[in-house]
Regions:
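N-terminal organellar transit peptides
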Residues: 1-42, 46-48, 59-65, 76-241
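Flexible, glycine/proline-enriched loop segments at strand-loop-helix junctions
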Residues: 71-73
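Catalytic cores of alpha/beta
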Residues: 52
Length: 241
């Protein structure tokens, strides 16, 4: 509502996060642009992978730092299995359910093949959503066919991302400022910074789940300790097979 705001630069430094969190932020950027007609520029820092790139695709222009790692277009679902650990310490879990699939994903037993099929279908659905979101944001730069070829979950350097049309240019924060000025038809402007503190409970979407991984400058060791079962647009190589 402040008429003095003529452009927004979003600095991204994140490996990604939960599917829903990523989609909410992406949608908020689109809604902001539609309501205000104010241009939004994405400035990728060290990491802008998976959910971070999902968010960037909502912006009018994407700039990556020369050392940025981005990409990781895909979905990961995490279901820990601690059955053998409990067996070693003599603990058994007795679970009563109303149906065979009610405790799907339980960490207290091995996952059944039919459960894997259910979760794989969900992962595939979220992956198609990811592809469509990126395509809608980048369709003037890349076709869906080319996007599908490079969206296999791998990460890219800034130079590779530029070659694949996932970003618009490589530069520094001054490049983002120059682009924001150009998109808003200004020759100069005052730059004001806003910082988001993750534990703030002041927004519409704030819930107790904020104590779990979200988008921001997370400590990955802490993230591993708090990662709950679910579906993520997240690059987390520590969970490698």
């Amino acid at each position: 509502e402040d008429p003095r705001i003529r452009a927004i630069i979003i600095r991204l430094d994140t490996p990604g996060g939960e599917v829903t969190t990523s989609d909410i932020i992406h949608n908020e950027i689109l809604r902001f642009k539609a309501e205000t007609k104010i241009p939004v520029v994405a400035m990728m820092m060290g990491l802008a992978t998976s959910g971070g790139y999902y968010i960037a695709s909502a912006c009018d222009h994407i700039i990556a730092h020369p050392s940025t790692i981005t990409g990781s277009i895909g979905v990961i679902s995490v279901f820990p299995n601690i059955e053998s650990l409990f067996g070693k310490i003599g603990v058994e879990m007795n679970v009563i359910t109303s149906g065979d699939m009610k405790d799907s994903g339980s960490p207290f037993r091995e996952m059944k093949s039919e459960e894997k099929e259910v979760f794989q279908a969900i992962v595939d659905t979220f992956y198609r959503k990811f592809l469509q979101v990126v395509y809608e944001g980048r369709k003037e730069q890349i076709s869906m066919e080319k996007l599908q070829k490079i969206a296999d979950g791998r990460v890219y350097t800034a130079q590779q991302a530029l070659e694949f049309k996932l970003i618009d240019e490589i530069g520094y924060i001054d490049s983002a400022i120059d682009k924001a000025l150009a998109l808003s038809d200004l020759s100069e402007a005052k730059i004001v910074g806003f910082t988001y503190y993750p534990k703030s409970k002041t927004n519409l979407y704030a819930t107790q789940l904020q104590e779990f991984p979200t988008l921001g400058n997370e400590d990955l060791q802490e993230m591993l300790q708090t990662l709950k079962s679910g579906f993520y647009y997240l690059w987390l190589p520590q969970l490698g097979r």
